[in-house]
Structure formats: structure tokens, C-alpha cells
Amino acid sequence: MASLFTSIPVELAVQIATVRLENNQSLHERTSPSAKEVIELLEFCLKSTEFLFRGSYYKQIHGTAMGSPVSVIEANLVMEELENNASSTFTQRPRLYCRFVDDTIAALKKTEIPKFHKHLNDQNVYIKFTVERDKKDGISFLDTLNQVNDDGSICTKAYRKPTHSERYLQFDSHQPLQHKGMVARALFSRATKICTPA
């Protein structure tokens, strides 16, 4: 997917949010504005996409604005709706389907991958998925490398993109000592939580 936020149609985002808010029985207990008022504010935020660059004003004409906190919420609502529609209408549901923002991993039979990919892309004219197939060393998802063992179990390892610099906070830098210790603890925690025991 090129950029998730700029691919989300504002009208679709507002439509999905409207249905969710109008069907939310406890909205009045959590906030004083009505569903209609929240939708009006949402529409105002999503359509206020003007910005100044080198002395000229521009307006984004499609999609939600990158960097806007409401764009993250709307992108997740739209993607959830799209995924629910796609999985409920596809003949063979994926055995595994996980998404974090715009990074998705799915497990299907190899023969079903092109069909499911097309089915996902048919859900919306603007939101398009790309496919990365399992390579001999596995497939990456977020910061994990996932491999299928001969017995069908999944083995996970820590994954770093080829652009990863391997640069961390230098111990002899003038940073607080607790920050330096947290770098080591975070790396250790990541390894123990992500990696499948050998």
C-alpha cells in the first residue's frame, strides 16, 4: 500500500464512523456531544487539510491527513470494516490474519493467495494491498521474521530491515545512565518476547 492515510477516502471514513457512533448505545454516558455533533466535528477535522509550503498554500484533495491524530483512528476503522467485509465474503478464510496500521500478515493456502489478494483489492478503489510471499528464510511482519517449520509450527526471530543502522545510544555519551540501561533492557526484552526458544 502506498500510504495508508492518504488512501483512506474521507467520505467512507465519515460513513463508517457515523454508523458506529449511531449504533453505540453508551455514547451519551461517555460524552455530552451527540453522535451528529461528533460527526460534524470529525468531518471538519478530516476536511481541514490545508497547509503552507514555501510561501504557497495547498489543500490535500484526497484521503486523510498524515500526522493528524484523527487519521489514525479513521484509518483503523476503515481498515477494520474493509477486512471484516473481505473475510466474511471470501470462500476460504485465512488461518491467520493480523494487521498493525498498514502492515499485514496472513496465512492461506498458496493457491488462495492471488484470489484473496484480488478480493481484498476489490473492496475499495483507493485502498490497495501488495503481496510479499514467504521466502526461504521466512516473511517479515513488523520486527519479526516468521518461518514455518516442517511440522507446521511457526518460529519467530527478531527482524531488522536492511536499512537498520545498528546504532544505539553510545555508553560514553552524556545521556542519563538510566537511559543507557533502558536501551540494553529494551533489546533484551524484545529478544525474549519475540524470539521462539531454540
Q: For each of these PLM feature ranges, what is it?
A:
Residues 1-198:
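Charged structural interfaces that engage phosphate-rich ligands
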